Swiss-Prot record:
Renumbered residue ranges of the record's region Disordered: 63-470, 602-670, 710-776
GO cellular component entries: cell surface; extracellular region
Alphabetical keyword list: Secreted, Signal
Domain of life (superkingdom): Eukaryota
Organism the protein comes from: Schizosaccharomyces pombe (strain 972 / ATCC 24843)
Signal peptide from the UniProt entry: 1-21
Subcellular location: Secreted; Cell surface
Stretches with biased composition (Low complexity): 73-314, 321-368, 375-444, 451-470, 710-720, 735-776
Biased composition (Polar residues): 63-72, 721-734
Name of the protein: Uncharacterized protein PB18E9.04c
Length: 800
């Protein structure tokens, strides 16, 4: 066969000589028998797997007559296994390593940003299962999701909470957040809201359920308070209260806001007490349900309200004429309102079943106002509680229990009452000042075509809330329980919402789209928004925390900080790391850029691309190689495989090809693994871009510029040398590099096909990267002739 091959080469050289002569190459282009034999031996010496090349280029002979231009893409990759905790940076293709001084025993929250509809169900600990996917119907345009679970570092803190605090969710459309704690979590029925294709935002911030030492603790969850856009009436009960006919005013379908203000149920002393609750007034457009149980109870407290009721102006008088200095160990009233449907039910302890109340899909509002159950003696009496009445979309009553009790406190009061109506004009601004031991000043909130309410929770020091000003929208500010005074500054938006979450973590992480704080105050960088709503949520902390708005354009940014130790799936790509990660912002048009930072010990899968490893993380970026006209370039897939050996390796390859026509394609997959004694097979795949045949005839092929290059590598087992032979433009090039085990990348592109193959083999303890980039298109007839001859020789050998 060798004789036949050499004879064929000589015959081809003789037949091609006249064509070369027509190009002025009569004396230069022919190949002697020795030259042909040298070329053959060089290819054989490099251990070329011709069968594999033939399989990937079955159309080589047919495409040789087209003379189509080919763009060559070379991929360079560096693998580093020197440490097990890398830091991710964005580059064309890079991985790096870094060590961290912190340890982690439980996960911290994750942040999710979304442009259309975002559904976040972050279970904690153990395993998580979801039998039916949550599939909201959204348009096929701009969506993004950012999931940022932080390493589960065990750190000590002066402000802790043994149970999760309530979650605050703000939405323009629909958002569902059900973060259970401990054990395993399951959700048998999907929550599938249908939303319009416009901006939505959601903020879900559960707090770590870990027990740590603290100077300010709370053994049961606090009530949540949220505010929004129309008006509702709150009826505090001693006994039971019911409302047979809902008051349903007509409100515009725009602007919503939500403010969540948990109140501590701690025992405090006061000089002003009342054994029955004061009424609260809230406003709402639709439904918000918040039932925070206490202690390790797995059953939510669900007060039973009779199906019949009286109007919204009825109010119970105090059950007794008593007053005195005393303490109250039950939670204070909470007022919640919202603008579409938002359900947030954070159970506590090791509960494995989420609390899922059934709520109608249309506007309702709930106001819960439990009285303090403490018996107090008094220096004065009150004949009946104060009452404020306003308009409402629908009214419901919830009563948070106290301590570890699963039964709500329900004092019995006489059925007499009095009421004083409130007058509203197309909008209502309400201020609710709960029970406190020191004076609390609440400033009204000014809105336009909407209602904003401010709720000041129970605190040991005065808390002042400044007004919020909005235009055709509502902006909310939430001030949580804190040991020092916290002042919330106004948020101003224009017909849109942007949310910022400042969670609780041990190491700060900063990016253009989100900010995660440490145990010390963290300030997030403001981002200007258009056509959205802005919401700021400040979590439980020992020192004041200031958060400034984030900004997007024609989109809504949502930040979700869940708590998870299991893999998270991202729609675009996922990156894992055990140390803080900084991502470089990506600018898009009519789209949203998503960044995922995930801590996990198992591989992660996602539709587009995924990178996950217990010791290495790779960040992929593609640079398109363009021809005369580029249509579009997409990106890569990276699958790190880890063996049982101590050292695991990762490899990331990225190829992108654009032809001179308007077609594009990108695809590259690379697998790398190792065992204790030998290398596994290297599996490569190629991407092919089909181009329309040119209008030129076959003889003109010799004057058409195109490239044929091959880069071939062989790595013997435990070898210390990698031999790479490359042939480009008819010139033989040999390069060799040595290392103690190495990684190499090879690419092969035949004369008239458009495929790029990348492969990588990583050895133990070290890695290196080699890349081969062939020269650009040949412009002279001589080089083109030599390339054509060489391509035909290779093809004939493979066929033979």
């Amino acid at each position: 066969m060798n004789r036949f091959f050499i004879s064929t080469l000589l015959l081809l050289a003789q037949h091609l000589a006249p064509a070369a002569a027509s190009c002025g190459l009569a004396n230069e282009a022919s190949l002697s028998a020795n030259e042909v034999q040298d070329i053959y031996h060089d290819f054989v010496a490099t251990s070329i797997n011709y069968a594999d090349l033939l399989k990937r280029n079955e159309d080589l002979n047919a495409s040789l007559s087209t003379g189509s231009p080919v763009e060559i893409t070379s991929t360079s990759c560096t693998t580093d296994t020197s440490a097990s905790t890398p830091i991710i940076t964005e580059s064309t293709s890079s991985t790096s390593s870094a060590s961290t001084t912190g340890s982690s025993s439980s996960p911290l929250p994750s942040t999710s940003t979304s442009c259309t509809t975002s559904t976040s169900i972050p279970p904690t600990g153990g395993s998580s299962s979801l039998s039916t996917p949550i599939t909201p119907t959204v348009p096929p345009t701009s969506t993004s999701s950012t999931s940022i679970p932080i390493p589960p570092t065990s750190t000590s803190s002066t402000d802790t909470n043994s149970n999760p605090l309530p979650t605050t969710s703000t939405s323009c459309t629909t958002s569902t957040s059900i973060p259970p704690t401990g054990g395993s979590s399951s959700l048998s029925t999907p929550i599938t809201p249908t939303v319009p294709p416009t901006s939505t935002s959601s903020t879900s911030i559960p707090i770590p359920p870990t027990s740590t030492s603290s100077t300010d603790t709370n053994s049961s969850p606090l009530p949540t308070t949220s505010t929004s856009c129309t008006t509702s009436t709150s009826i505090p009960t001693g006994g039971s209260s019911s409302l047979s006919t809902p008051i349903t005013p007509t409100v515009p379908p725009t602007s919503t806001s939500s403010t969540s203000i948990p109140i501590p149920p701690t025992s405090t002393s006061s000089t002003d007490t009342n054994s029955s609750p004061l009424p609260t007034t809230s406003t709402s457009c639709t439904t918000s349900t918040s039932i925070p149980p206490t202690g390790n109870s797995t059953t939510p407290v669900t007060p039973t309200v009779p199906p019949t009721s009286t109007s919204s102006t009825s109010t119970p008088p105090p059950p007794a004429s008593t007053s005195s200095t005393g303490t109250s160990s039950s939670p204070l009233p909470s007022t919640s309102t919202s603008c579409t449907t938002s359900t947030s039910i954070p159970p506590t302890g090791n509960s494995t079943t989420p609390v899922t109340p059934t709520v109608p899909p249309t506007s309702t509002s709930s106001t819960s106002t439990p009285p303090p159950p403490a018996s107090t003696s008094s220096t004065g009496t009150s004949s009946s509680p104060l009452l404020s009445t306003s308009t409402s979309c629908t009214t419901s009553t919830s009563i948070p229990p106290t301590g570890n009790s699963t039964t709500p406190v329900t004092p019995t009061v006489p059925p007499t009452s009095s009421s004083t109506p409130l007058t509203t004009t197309n909008c209502t601004t309400s201020t609710s000042v709960p029970y406190t031991s020191t004076p609390v000043t609440s400033t009204p909130l000014a809105t336009t075509n909407c209602t904003t309410s401010t709720s000041v929770p129970y605190t040991s020091t005065p808390v002042t809330s400044t007004p919020l000003t909005t235009t055709n929208c509502t902006t909310s500010t939430s001030i949580p329980y804190t040991s020092t005074p916290v002042t919330s500054t106004p948020l101003t938006t224009t017909n849109c919402t942007t949310s910022t979450s400042v969670p609780y973590t041990s190491t700060p992480v900063t990016s253009s789209n989100y900010t995660i704080s440490s145990s010390t105050p963290v300030t997030s960088t403001p981002v200007t928004t258009t056509n959205c709503t802005t919401s700021t949520s400040v979590l439980y902390t020992s020192t004041p925390v200031t958060s400034t708005p984030l900004a997007t354009t024609n989109c809504t940014t949502s930040t979700s900080v869940p708590y998870t130790s299991t893999p998270v799936t991202s729609s675009n790509y996922t990156i894992s790391s055990s140390t803080p990660v900084t991502s470089t912002p990506v600018t898009t048009t009519n789209c949203t850029t998503s960044t995922s930072v995930l801590y996990t010990s198992t591989p992660i899968t996602s539709p587009n691309s995924t990178s996950s490893s217990s010791t290495q993380v790779s960040w992929n970026s593609t640079t398109p190689i363009t021809g005369t006209s580029t249509s579009k370039v997409t990106s890569s897939t990276s699958i790190p495989l880890t063996s049982t050996n101590r050292t695991s390796t990762t490899f990331t390859s990225s190829t992108s090809i654009s032809t001179s026509s308007s077609s594009t394609a990108t695809s590259s997959t690379s697998f790398a693994s190792e065992s204790s004694s030998f290398y596994s097979n290297v599996t490569t795949s190629s991407s092919t871009v089909s181009t329309p045949p040119p209008t030129t005839s076959f003889p003109s092929t010799f004057t058409t510029s195109f490239i044929t290059s091959s880069s071939l590598s062989s790595i013997p087992n435990n070898s210390t040398e990698v031999k790479t032979a490359s042939t480009s433009s008819g010139t033989e090039i040999k390069t060799a590099s040595t290392s103690s085990g190495s990684s190499s990348s090879s690419s092969y592109t035949p004369a008239s096909s458009t495929s790029t193959t990348t492969s990588s083999v990583s050895s133990r303890q070290s890695s290196s990267s080699s890349s081969f980039t062939p020269s650009s298109a040949i412009s002279t007839a001589k080089s083109s002739f030599v390339l054509s001859t060489l391509s035909i020789l290779i093809a004939l050998y493979m066929v033979a």
